[in-house]
Amino acid sequence: CLEELQRDGRVKSSLEFLAMDPGYAPANRALIEENAALLELPLHIFETQIFGAVASVEKNPCYLCARMRRGYLYEEAKKLGCNKIALGHHFDDVIETILMGIFYGGQMQSMPPKLKSTSHPGMQLIRPLYYVHEEDIVRWKEHNGLSFLRCACRFTENCARHEEESKRYEMKKLVAQMKKTNPNADISIFRSAYNVHVDTLIEYDTKGKRYPFLERYDEK
């Protein structure tokens, strides 16, 4: 994706291909290296011991793991002279996140296409596959003979991530069911994040400040 943009020439940029080994089993590490070789990518792999660090965390170890991984990626990217990190979240991830927030979090929020780091000044996180559907990525993977890893964490079977993954899969099945009667259901969910009418909300939060409906109503 980013190589295509670079070849297009309208966006001037340089690329570094970075992957972290947080404590993978040798077979999983080899799979990443094989994928990079198939695509002829000059992949820079750096090692951490994140899996070992979160092994004893009983409550929400996946949240801690994700935070630590993000921090290590920012630090390593800065060493390479980068100011942005591109992650692989796609269209389906966005709509599943919206639905998980509604059904399991009691909140309405989406996954933004880019973020400025609050802990690493000058660094941004971008999601270039934001509009790309998962089925298209799967076809691309199969066309190129690649094999993808999921979490690959040795502790997944005993932690809350297993429940989270089942919830995400539940949302995936729900969307598939909805598309049987409304083929554009996924697009409508995605577009809902573009069409938020805050005046109709009972309460909303922006930049850490909450705005209850009654307070806004009395101001009118």
Can you name each region flagged by the protein language model?
Residues 68-80, 114-120, 173-192:
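Short, basic, helix/turn surface patches
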Residues 64, 86, 128, 132, ...:
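A short glycine-/small-residue-rich loop at the edge of a beta-strand within enzyme catalytic domains
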Residues 1-100, 104-108, 112, 135-143, ...:
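ATP-dependent adenylation/nucleotidyltransferase module used to activate substrates
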Residues 40-60, 123, 199-215:
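Mobile, glycine- and charge-enriched loop segments
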Residues 21-23, 49-51, 117, 131, ...:
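Short, solvent-exposed coil/turn elements at secondary-structure transition points
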Residues 92-174:
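Catalytic subdomain that performs nucleotidyl-dependent activation
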Residues 146-220:
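The feature marks non-catalytic terminal segments
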